[in-house]
From Swiss-Prot:
It catalyses: RNA(n) + a ribonucleoside 5'-triphosphate = RNA(n+1) + diphosphate. In plastids the minimal PEP RNA polymerase catalytic core is composed of four subunits: alpha, beta, beta', and beta''. When a (nuclear-encoded) sigma factor is associated with the core the holoenzyme is formed, which can initiate transcription. GO terms for molecular function: DNA binding; DNA-directed RNA polymerase activity; protein dimerization activity. Its EC number is 2.7.7.6. It comes from Phaeodactylum tricornutum (strain CCAP 1055/1). InterPro entries: DNA-dir_RNA_pol_insert, DNA-dir_RNA_pol_RpoA/D/Rpb3, DNA-dir_RpoA, RBP11-like, RNAP_asu_C, RNApol_insert_sf. This is DNA-directed RNA polymerase subunit alpha.
Length: 311
């Protein structure tokens, strides 16, 4: 195993309190970059949880198609504005907040009376404008969850007096990664992984990365610690029986071949590793403009990245 290292290349706040971080993971073995990158991306976007407003009760309002006298926005517009409020909390229990404002006034998120432990990341976020002396009174339901929940999924009988919101719980908004090959003095290949994480500001990219890594560790720890595994029934895998099926759907772009080799393969309608494996070395070299040098490059890449040898 190489001496893997990780460092933060960039950490910055962008508009509306959102955050961006870029990380570099060095000294990975060939093939590990895409494995780690894909796994982290899935967990960052799908498994990390957060707190959000899931429902509201507005005084004098029974359905979302109503209007409030003296308030510029209708109820649908107010609900849409409330979806943009970003919250953070260390408490995962359902909690309630309250807002009561008399006009004329511009109503923003910082006017909400929050429950203990809940913090609003974008306090200047706009909610509504009251143009008369009327009162706008709203009760907020704060819930912890993960992913994206439609308003229809949030409804429970006890909430019949509440208006449900489409709720975005996930604190990570976007994840990108790219892999670069590094050659040492003896022409051995290692990989480095660049990982970019954008969050809504309720969690830092660094904390998000640590949390995602911990989720993955916990998952595989369960497999390691499973005492119900019957050691007597372990399968002994022999090299010749290893399946290459998991690699067949990998696009040839992931192999990061030279432009010449890549273009020749694409012109021959070879789009995936699975397509490539249908060719013997001799048949591969029969492709138009595909010389010995390109063939050697493909053979070497398949062996070093995926452990596959064409026969």
């Amino acid at each position: 195993m190489n001496n893997i290292s990780i460092k933060c290349l960039k950490s910055e706040k962008i508009q509306s309190g959102a955050c961006h971080g870029q990380f570099l993971i060095n000294s990975l073995n060939p093939g590990q970059g895409i494995t780690i990158g894909n796994q982290l991306r899935r967990v960052l976007l799908g498994d990390l949880g957060g707190v959000a407003i899931s429902a509201v009760r507005i005084a004098g309002i029974t359905h979302e198609f109503s209007t409030i006298p003296g308030v510029r926005e209708d109820i649908l517009e107010i609900l849409l504005n409330l979806k943009g409020i970003i919250c953070t909390s260390q408490i995962q229990d359902t909690q309630f907040g309250h807002l009561k404002v008399q006009g004329p006034s511009v109503v923003t998120a910082d006017l909400i009376q929050l429950p203990p432990g809940v913090e609003i990341i974008n306090p200047n976020h706009y909610i509504a404008t009251i143009s008369t002396s009327n009162i706008l009174e709203i009760e907020f339901k704060f819930e912890y969850g993960s992913g994206y929940h439609l308003a229809s999924q949030n409804f429970v009988e006890e909430d019949e007096n509440y208006l449900q919101l489409d709720t975005i719980f996930m604190p990570v908004q976007k994840v990108d990664f790219k892999i670069e090959n590094i050659y040492d003095a003896t022409n051995n290949i290692s990989e480095r992984l660049f990982l970019d994480i954008w969050t809504n500001g309720s969690i830092s990219p660094n904390d998000a990365l640590e949390s995602a890594a911990q989720v993955i560790i916990d998952l595989f720890t369960l497999l390691i610690n499973n005492k119900n595994i019957n050691n007597n029934n372990r399968l002994e895998l022999k090299p010749e029986t290893i399946s290459i099926e998991p690699y067949t759907n990998i696009a040839i772009e992931e192999l990061q071949l030279s432009v010449r080799a890549y273009n020749c393969l694409k012109k021959a309608q070879i789009n995936t590793v699975g397509d490539l494996l249908q060719y013997s070395p001799e048949k591969l070299q029969e492709l138009k403009n595909f010389g010995r040098k390109s063939a050697d490059e493909v053979f070497s890449t398949l062996k070093n990245k995926l452990g596959i040898i064409l026969k």
